[in-house]
Amino acid sequence: MKYMTADEIRQSFLKYFESKGHTIVKSASIIPENDPTLLFVNAGMVPFKNVFLGLEERPYKRAASCQKVFRVSGKHNDLENVGYTPRHHTFFEMLGNFSFGDYFKKEAIEFAWEYLTEHLEIPKEKLLVSVFEEDDEAFEIWNKHIGLDESKIKRMGYKDNFWSMGDTGPCGPSSEIYYDRGEKFGNPEFGAEDDFRYLEIWNLVFMQYNRDEKGVLHPLPNPSIDTGMGLERIASVLQGVDSNYDTDLFKPIIQFAEEVSGKEYGKNEKDDIAMRVIADHLRAITFLISDGVLPANEGRGYVLRRIIRRALRYGKNLGIEKPFLYEGVDVVIEKMKTAYPELIQNRSFIKTITKSEEEKFIKTLKRSMDILYQMIEQARKENRRHLTGEETFKLYDTYGFPIDLMEEILKDEGFTFDLIEFHNLLEEQKERARKSWKSQSKEIKPVYLTLKNKLPENQFVGYETLTSENSKVLAIIKGDQLVDTAKEGEDIEIVLDITPFYPEKGGQIGDRGIIEGDEFLFEVLDTQTPVDGLIVHKGKVLFGSVKEGAYVRAKTDKERRENIMRHHTATHLLHAALRNVLGDHVKQAGSLVSDEYLRFDFTHFESMTDEELKAVEELVNREIMKNEEVVCQEMQYEEALKSGAMAIFEEKYADVVRVISAGISKELCGGTHVKRTGDIGYFKILSESAVSSGTRRIEAVAGIKAVEKGLQEHYIIKDLSRLLTAKEDQLLDRVLKLQNQIKEKEREIENLRKKLALSNINENLNIIEKEGFKVAYVSVENLNPNELREIADHLRQKLGKSVILVASKDAEKQKVNFVVAVSKELSENYKAGDIVKKVASAANGSGGGRPDFAQGGINDTSKLSQLFEEFKKIFS
């Protein structure tokens, strides 16, 4: 058996299948493209899902890939096992070969056997296989054609050897190949539960059926093949180690964990588990952030946040108290950079995001520790020796407090907590998250799928021209149905063979315009691409009737498109300027490009200063003034990245990509752009704000929209200059001076109101003499709670030992504000907070506070007398 490094195995696998006529497809992003039903790519076949479903055509029938895969949820939830077993991972690489209606079982089995035994030189006697119990064909191929003895072929049921994409759709039997690790792992029966001897290394899925809504299986006209072999597993076999964590993929990261912790791997099982968790999670963190996932409180970002916090928790178990994961990112990149060169480009960004999240969690953990001890103290006061599930879940969910650390602290304090209630709340939260995620899923109308399979791909000519003189109407959609004709006033969708209309994608909105024929005029209100390769024009028939098969003139709204192009190229310049001013950690996190304005979301950890915004705006405008040519080139994806072109995180790119070079910007982009930077005209930032933690948003305008905004601000300044009788360069000083004058006048007015209120109090104050103290109450007009407090303090000093209520009607809001002040000597028996609650509740109000001072309010001015009566009752 040949020893091979992981890089050598990856290269060998792809080279072998390339020699067998397979197109090598680079790994897709971990973030699934156009599939909101999945949080992450969790299998090697996911990027080919639409091909298997017949929704997408590729220029090849055979493919092979090494796909980045991430599993933490659904049926593929490996998180809790990570670090505790030799094989479970969150992130791993899946080697796979695929056939889309080309070869089938015989060839798939032949390829797998030949590659394993001849190219990897695994001894044949070490290999066993399983087949679906009813799949006689696969059994015969293994037995008769390959020559595998019957004793090494195990028939298994639906659970183990029948694969399906979902409740309905493509499915079929599978055949799994196992490696016998030898008698030192026991002598269990092949296929038994908890079998550590026989290691599954390759799964061959034979997609030959379509399951309908009733569960009935129908043979597919073009059966397909989907196979998957985990790189980490096959590496453990070829490198002769018992655990994936002992392969060259993980050893450098575990060595890093040893160095940063001062512990030695292999000496203590608890420490070993922690190091394995850190090694796995560091790989996941690096690839997730590189592919565009950012820490957040929901969705993919929440998963990343959990992974980072889980790794930190295990680091704490090793005695690591400071941020350290960001340093380990370098180790992961060094190991994986050959296969994934984009990691090098994203290194600084990945480290910045990781370190920031580590620092936040360490601060949060300190705060949540304080809250936990407060909960323990409160429980002791209530004679409880346990915390509720609700209390502990809040710490876990809101603050990310590790549950095992919580258990340890509670145990040390002699406490327990309601674990059942905690898990119930956890499941409820997971279910809410699942429903929230699924609700984002957009169903593709069956009519679009029908057209996708029926029609040739639309030809888009909108890069070169805004008008197509001789397009043909291929289809008309009304509602969810295909129709032959549509008449005046009807809302429909039209599909053309050739179109200049750009469909909404990549943040750029869809084009508008008209489609006209000899007998009709159709207004295009939006252009969309519901499935790849199908462009639909949505709008209304203005007059006449349109028929399928008609030849038409399609004309895009020229002014609108030009404004969109200005904003799109301006967005590229803005992105480059932000990186120039703020640093390379800036990455696009979302965008909207319209004819009216642009919106650009980007990664940054604090609000931008006025100086930074000014520098960005000035840099963009300098690039516009240079009036350089905007160059569009088509090149191979890898070549584009090497040339320095920026790739946007969540975009999917073909092997051949468009690279847009505009001044300081060079990006991969499929959108429409101006010919020269000077065509943008002028650029102006409107606002900068927060979207979420670590993500900022800039809204801006370009071209005539920017000129309009500039003119609007110019005339506002002129009007202000006239109104304030100051020159434009003196406006700021004039406004500051006016503000100070207004504040001074407000202070004078406030003092006069207080004096007036105090003079009225002497006439209206009601005093009840009690034994050893006084009870007083009074009503004053239109004072706020702070002013009421000052009056109450004044009366308390004047009257000596006393309990005082001061109330004020707010006529405008139809509300009564009131305060109660109690001398400290009386606050043990007459607590201000209790008095406020009692009198407020009697008048349907609310309030509370300290024993010596409290405040409240009621939303009905007619109940003021009732408030006073309740107050007097307390002392009667």
Curated annotation (Swiss-Prot):
Question: Does the UniProt entry include the keyword Protein biosynthesis?
Answer: yes
- What's its catalytic activity? tRNA(Ala) + L-alanine + ATP = L-alanyl-tRNA(Ala) + AMP + diphosphate
Q: What is this protein called?
A: Alanine--tRNA ligase
Q: According to the UniProt record, what class of enzyme is this?
A: ligase
Q: Which UniProt keywords apply?
A: Aminoacyl-tRNA synthetase, ATP-binding, Cytoplasm, Ligase, Metal-binding, Nucleotide-binding, Protein biosynthesis, RNA-binding, tRNA-binding, Zinc
Q: Which Pfam families match?
A: DHHA1 (PF02272), tRNA-synt_2c (PF01411), tRNA_SAD (PF07973)
Query: Where would you find this protein in the cell?
Result: Cytoplasm
Q: Which GO terms describe its biological process?
A: alanyl-tRNA aminoacylation
**According to the record, how does the cofactor bind?**
Binds 1 zinc ion per subunit.
The UniProt entry's sequence similarity note says:
Belongs to the class-II aminoacyl-tRNA synthetase family.
PANTHER family from the UniProt entry = ALANINE--TRNA LIGASE, CYTOPLASMIC, ALANYL-TRNA SYNTHETASE
Q: Which GO terms describe its cellular component?
A: cytosol
Which molecular function GO terms apply here? alanine-tRNA ligase activity; aminoacyl-tRNA deacylase activity; ATP binding; tRNA binding; zinc ion binding
Q: What is known of its domains?
A: Consists of three domains; the N-terminal catalytic domain, the editing domain and the C-terminal C-Ala domain. The editing domain removes incorrectly charged amino acids, while the C-Ala domain, along with tRNA(Ala), serves as a bridge to cooperatively bring together the editing and aminoacylation centers thus stimulating deacylation of misacylated tRNAs.
Q: Which cofactor does it need?
A: Zn(2+)
The cross-references to InterPro entries, in alphabetical order and at most eight, read: aa-tRNA-synth_II (IPR006195), aa-tRNA-synth_II/BPL/LPL (IPR045864), Ala-tRNA-lgiase_IIc (IPR002318), Ala-tRNA-ligase_IIc_anticod-bd (IPR018162), Ala-tRNA-synth_IIc_core (IPR018165), Ala-tRNA-synth_IIc_N (IPR018164), Ala-tRNA_ligase (IPR050058), Ala_tRNA_ligase_euk/bac (IPR023033)
